[in-house]
Design a protein with these regions (language model features):
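...captures the hydrophobic TM-helix bundle architecture rather than a specific catalytic motif
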Residues: 1-205
């Protein structure tokens, strides 16, 4: 049995079904990351020194070394959010070539973010700063690792919508445009999470 898809707005919410669904999903994501941020705040406020004493000097030095990478990644994700919006606008204007260009740029930005993150992780692990090293590194890898998984998930979805999924445009353009809007909301949320992670984990230590 196939579930019918409606592009019309619901009378009770003013949203179409897919958009209502993504907002409910993002609400659960807010609770997930909110719990992790709350745990971080409790750990930090309860510690006499942060990062934890012992290798404190080394950790702070390592953090300073990786701030440029994190700053670059922040700019990359902001650009990706802008191009995501422009891809959706291009579809509203029925310009498929511009849509592919802008969404392709979003994907490139996402891949750049992941590559930079890979080198950042490799550097930390090479220096011996693994999750088991101390409390700070444990929550650092937990929060940024979870964020990376969300980025990877977004890459798969956007890659599909840029590639084979684009066939829907020929038969159901409005439905396809809605899909891009829903995917964009997810992508903006992932970017917003990083906007909070960046200062909390890199700048305020």
């Amino acid at each position: 049995m196939e579930i019918p898809y409606n592009v019309e707005l619901r009378k009770d919410t003013g949203l179409y079904n897919a958009k209502l669904g993504i907002w409910l999903f993002l609400a659960s994501e807010v609770m997930l990351f909110g719990g992790l941020f709350s745990a971080y705040i409790l750990l930090r406020t309860g510690a006499p020194l942060w990062p934890p004493i012992g290798e404190q000097g080394s950790i702070i030095h390592l953090l300073k070394d990786t701030i440029p990478h994190a700053t670059f990644n922040t700019v990359v994700l902001i650009v990706s959010s802008v191009t995501m919006v422009m891809a959706w606008v291009a579809l509203k204007q029925k310009n498929l070539s511009k849509y592919k260009m802008y969404l392709g740029t979003t994907l490139i930005c996402a891949l750049i973010f992941l590559i930079v993150k890979y080198f950042e992780y490799s550097h930390k692990i090479h220096e011996g700063f693994v999750p088991a090293h101390d409390t700070y590194m444990a929550i650092y890898f937990t929060m940024t690792g979870l964020h990376v998984l969300h980025i990877i998930g977004g890459v798969f979805v956007l890659g599909y919508l840029w590639g084979p999924g684009i066939k829907m445009w020929n038969s159901e353009p409005e439905r396809f445009t809605n899909r891009i809007e829903v995917a964009g909301l997810y992508w903006h949320f992932v970017d917003l999470v990083w906007i909070f992670l960046f200062p909390v984990l890199y700048l305020l230590n």
